[in-house]
């Protein structure tokens, strides 16, 4: 199944129930988990080599690299912008490595600051601002039930030095 799994917990539960009922395996397209560096760090986390992990930072940022093909810019069809597209991979890795999936509180903001501009300077070509209905940046902070905290940063269009930053800090 492509990520994210569903748009709400009720739909996700239906998918899990169907998998159990039919005996089929259900997996979500979080391929970053299978990179050698991810597997190495996950093993270190599981072995306790990093101690008590109480802070994580999930980062997926691009410098003016908005995908202009497909349905990426259509909120109705895509469900959201960079948080749904690339940020979900960084957040998945962070939660997986921390082995912590129980949020207590979430706060965040989304921004559409560049999507309404005619001339974008975008690496993958210009877009029609009238068709750009998703956010171009999303930032959040998650407090987990055990007191751990996670900072989340996702953007297709920040004015940053590095053209592509995808990092998980623990």
PLM regions with names:
Residues 1-33, 48:
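Beta-strand-loop-alpha-helix segment that lines the small-molecule cofactor/substrate pocket
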Residues 140-142:
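Short beta-strand scaffold segments in enzyme catalytic cores
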Residues 10, 36, 161-162:
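Residues that form or flank phosphate/diphosphate-binding pockets in enzymes
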Residues 22-25, 52-54, 136, 146-150:
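Short, well-ordered coil/turn segments that N-cap beta-strands
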Residues 128-135, 145-170:
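NAD(P)-dinucleotide binding in Rossmann-like oxidoreductases
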Residues 5, 60, 154-158:
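Short, well-ordered turn and helix-capping elements at secondary-structure junctions
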Residues 25, 32-132:
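Predominantly a Rossmann-like dinucleotide-binding segment in NAD(P)-dependent oxidoreductases
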């Amino acid at each position: 199944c492509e990520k994210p799994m569903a748009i709400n917990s009720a739909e996700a539960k239906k998918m899990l129930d169907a998998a159990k009922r039919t005996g089929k395996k259900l997996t979500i397209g979080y391929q970053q988990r299978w990179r050698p560096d991810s597997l190495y760090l996950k093993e270190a986390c599981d072995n306790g080599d990093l101690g008590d992990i109480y802070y994580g930072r999930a980062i997926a940022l691009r410098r003016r690299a908005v995908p202009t093909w497909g349905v990426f810019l259509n909120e109705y069809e895509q469900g959201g912008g960079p948080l749904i597209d690339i940020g979900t991979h960084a957040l998945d890795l962070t939660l997986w490595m921390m082995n912590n999936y129980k949020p207590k509180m979430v706060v965040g903001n989304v921004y559409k600051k560049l999507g309404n501009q005619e001339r974008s300077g975008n690496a993958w070509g210009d877009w029609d601002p009238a068709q750009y209905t998703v956010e171009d940046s999303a930032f959040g902070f998650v407090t987990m039930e055990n007191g751990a905290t996670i900072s989340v940063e996702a953007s297709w269009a920040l004015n940053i030095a590095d053209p592509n930053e995808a990092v998980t800090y623990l």
